[in-house]
């Protein structure tokens, strides 16, 4: 008897993570330069590491409060209020999670009944498609390639017209992975108007918010500003503070929604390690300059990579946030993006991520990550130029 045949059938709908299989392949190639990395190449700031180590030395190694430590919850509330002007009650409207990955899982699981539809703008990282399937719902990919990779009210409305009352959630990732597109506040306000007063939750994934390149009042656009009562806000420390391995993030929502989210969070993970939360609190309280320093370097790298691709004749997005450029494969090269990426890795020793791994609209594109040293980017461009020249 094959016991795996008797497991939950919904899991067959969970997409496989081809991106990780591709990463294993590229790492096997000696001398390859990788523009595939989805995490900062910086190390966690020293003062944040010291706070974590001090917490361990002080025996902050026991169970933490399930919702989060009082200190971190308060710091999150203050930080969110400063950035987007919304005050969440630290005692009742915020949960500390094991990364945004867990927050996304808790959010989708908590709002989805069997048969419900979650609208997921694509191209995007596949986590929300998987979460919807695990929850017994259906992720419907909203292909934004038709609108220059920007989510528009008209595009959302077309899917609402098609799926009607089945739609339970809309995911809004801003800035976006893999395109780097960042919607401004006017765009987000218009999106909010489409779902306002409908029984539709907005899951606002803002993990890259401090890596947006706008300045002044436009630096932190958020759909929370115009639709707080329907929005579940997800954010964390992985991208802005180079803390991917610490696994700490948070979710914010009105108390009645947070109480339901807590049921999923509490039974799934119990809590986030106390010393990790102490380090995250240090990041928010005393590390406000850290994201800005990283952002300045990302901008320099973006400019070099963008200019280099333009000179090679590649059609690309010009990212306004995160650390990715999404580029259309030129017509004279292999148009199957997966085949192209494997060939480029083998023959030019340059690793980029196939666009189709990010869902509808990604076909024929590849993602370049500039979360790497400037010299690596220049080497990759030089190798790409030679690869392209040999195939014209």
Located regions from the model:
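PLP-dependent aminotransferase-like
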Residues: 109-172
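PLP-dependent aminotransferase class I/II
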Residues: 45, 230-321
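Helix C-cap/helix->beta junction micro-motif
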Residues: 29, 135, 197-198, 312, ...
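Conserved PLP-binding catalytic core of the aspartate aminotransferase-like
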Residues: 298-299, 312-347
């Amino acid at each position: 008897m094959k016991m795996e045949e008797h497991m939950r059938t919904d899991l067959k709908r969970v997409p496989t993570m081809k991106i990780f299989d591709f990463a294993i392949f590229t790492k096997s190639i000696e001398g390859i330069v990788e523009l595939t990395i989805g995490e900062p190449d910086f190390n966690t700031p020293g003062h944040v590491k010291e706070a974590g180590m001090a917490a361990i030395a002080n025996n902050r190694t026991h169970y933490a409060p399930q919702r989060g430590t009082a200190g971190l919850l308060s710091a999150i509330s203050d930080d969110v209020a400063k950035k987007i002007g919304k005050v969440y009650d630290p005692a009742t409207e915020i949960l500390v999670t094991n990364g945004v990955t867990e927050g996304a899982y808790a959010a989708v699981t908590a709002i989805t009944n069997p048969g419900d539809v979650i609208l997921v703008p694509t191209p995007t990282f596949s986590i929300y498609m998987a979460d919807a399937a695990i929850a017994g719902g259906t992720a419907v990919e909203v292909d934004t390639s038709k609108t220059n990779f920007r989510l528009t009210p008209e595009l959302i409305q077309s899917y609402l017209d098609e799926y009607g009352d089945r739609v339970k959630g809309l995911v809004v990732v801003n800035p976006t992975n893999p395109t780097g597109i960042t919607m401004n506040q006017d765009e987000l306000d218009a999106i909010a108007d489409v779902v306002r007063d409908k029984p539709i939750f907005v899951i606002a994934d803002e993990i890259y918010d401090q890596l947006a390149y706008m300045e002044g009042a436009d630096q932190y656009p958020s759909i929370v500003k115009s639709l707080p009562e329907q929005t579940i806000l997800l954010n964390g420390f992985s991208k802005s503070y180079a803390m991917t391995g610490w696994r700490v993030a948070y979710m914010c929502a009105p108390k009645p929604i947070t109480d339901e989210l807590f049921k999923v969070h509490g039974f799934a993970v119990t809590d986030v390690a106390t010393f990790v939360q102490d380090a995250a609190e240090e990041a928010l309280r005393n590390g406000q300059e850290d994201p800005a320093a990283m952002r300045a370097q990302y901008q320099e790298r973006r400019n070099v990579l963008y200019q280099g691709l333009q000179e090679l004749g590649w059609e690309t997005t010009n990212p306004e946030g995160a650390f990715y450029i999404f580029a259309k494969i030129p017509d004279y090269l292999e148009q199957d993006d997966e085949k192209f990426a494997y060939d480029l890795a083998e023959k030019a020793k340059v690793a980029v991520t196939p666009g189709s791994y990010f869902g509808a609209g990604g076909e024929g594109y590849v993602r370049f990550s500039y979360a790497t040293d400037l010299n690596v980017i220049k080497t990759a461009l030089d190798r790409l130029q030679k690869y392209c020249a040999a195939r014209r």
